[in-house]
Amino acid sequence: MTVNLVTGFDKVHEIIKQSLEAELTENGLLEDVETFIPVYTNEEHVDEPVVWMHQLETIPGRQADISGTMELTTPFQFNCAVYEVEIEDANIATQNLANRVALSILKNWQTIQSQELEPGKRMIKNITFQRYYPLGTIEVNGKSERLPVTGIVLEVHHIVNWQMCCRNLTNNQGD
C-alpha cells in the first residue's frame, strides 16, 4: 500500500535521516562522526568528521499523472569530510565515511520505514546508487589546512497516492 502526498514527502526525508542517526551511536557504523547536518543550510560550528545531508529536487520516475498513484525519485546527496594530517590519508578516510553513510542507509531504511508508517503501508520502493565523487576541499577556519570532501548521491524511489490525499482532505473538511 502507498501513502498520501502530504505524508510522503515528509516521511522520505525523516526515514533517510533516521537511518543515519541510528548509526551515530556507540558501535554504530558512524560512531566517529562528530557533526551530522540533516538540513540544507547550517550556520553553526562544525566538528569533523562531518556528514552533511542534502535533499535534492524530487522528480517523477515516469510520466506524472496527478490523478492517482505516482512514482517519484528524490536524490539525497551526502557530503563527507574527515581531517587527517596527511591529505592522502584524509582522502581515504573521507571516502570510507561516504561508503559507511551508504551502508547505514542500506542497513536501516526498511526497518525505520516499517516503524514510521502504519502497518501494511509502504512508501519507499527502493534506493539506488547514483553518484560517488570527490568534491574538492573545504577550508578550516583559523587554519591553513583544508579538508577533502567526498560526495555520494543515492536516489530514493517512492510512491505517493494523490487520490488518497484528496480523499483525506475531503473527509476532514467536516471536522
Would you name each region that the model predicts?
Residues 1-67, 112-123, 168-175:
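Small/polar-rich, solvent-exposed N-terminal microdomains that initiate assembly or binding
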Residues 23, 32-33, 75, 79, ...:
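Low-complexity, intrinsically disordered/propeptide-like segments
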Residues 23, 47-52, 96-159:
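Acidic-leaning, charged glycine-interspersed low-complexity segments
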Residues 44-46, 59-73, 138-148:
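Short, surface-exposed loop and linker segments with low hydrophobicity and enrichment for Pro/Ser/Thr
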Residues 68-87, 145-160:
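Oligomerization/assembly interface segments of phage tail-like spikes and tubes
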Residues 69-72, 81-111:
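Extracellular/virion structural assembly segments
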Residues 162-166:
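Long, contiguous binding/interaction regions
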